[in-house]
Amino acid sequence: MSTAHNRANIEDVAKVVLMPGDPLRAKLIAESLLKDAVLFNDVRGMLGYTGTYKGKRVSVMGSGMGMASMGIYSYELFKFYDVDAIIRVGSTGSYSERLPMKSVALVKGSYSESTYA
């Protein structure tokens, strides 16, 4: 079933989706880490692939920039494609010197003081 932002059929998308912001980073991850990766989406330039990693079926798809774009793609993946988990991968900034460049952060949650929608 296609949506306005995703051309995939439900069986094209794995239960676990890695989501970098940059669609070209999704392509790089698919080409370098996934075995037998197949493109399932290219609508609006947002690339999505499914393949296997160490025998586990995994998808990777760009989210675009910002919360609005992430909100659209994550909503559709959960609501229409029966995804169980989305794992955000990629870069970010830090306000703390305790978290130096090239650190790895495993985040359990986040919040915003924004009043945006």
Residue ranges and their predicted role:
Residues 42-117:
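Glycine-rich phosphate- or other oxyanion-binding loops that anchor nucleotides, phosphorylated ligands
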